[in-house]
Amino acid sequence: MTKKRLKVGIIAAEHSSDRLGAKIIESLKDIFEVDLYGLGGPEVNASPITTPNGIDYHDLHVMGLIDPLIKLPKIFLNRRKLLKLFISSDIDIFIGVDSPDFNIFFHKKLKLNNVKTIQVVSPSVWGWRENRIKTIEAYIDLTMCLFKFECDFYSKKNMQSFFLGHPFSQ
């Protein structure tokens, strides 16, 4: 039986998100012929992935107060390059893995282009900055949660979520 082709945009810009992203990609490959576009680390890159020239996974790693300020121009440039890649590749689905403050930009822009959006690792709206729930509701089709109580939180808001489980518990 021929598998349906699925164009997937993904951003997994941290070590832990790289591992989660790679597992999701492998699961998708069981069902679909997957074309990958975006950015990941060594585990995501074990699958063929189209990444814009000049973007490195480590360019998005920032810590503290000064590091983000120094890297901000490059982060904005890389963000524009990735968005251009996703739109020009006509992706079917976007998967943002962790890094919700970075990935929400893509969720917003791609949702306006009728792309299905998934956020893997729920933003901690249940703990702080609960006002982000409106943004999540508007721009993210499915949130994959590491903890069961996060799914319960989204369920009470009538939002789609899926309990993925925490990698340390598996």
Spans of features found by a protein language model:
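Short, flexible hinge/linker loops that cap or flank conserved catalytic cores
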Residues: T2-K3
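Active-site and donor-binding regions of nucleotide-sugar-utilizing enzymes
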Residues: L6-Q170
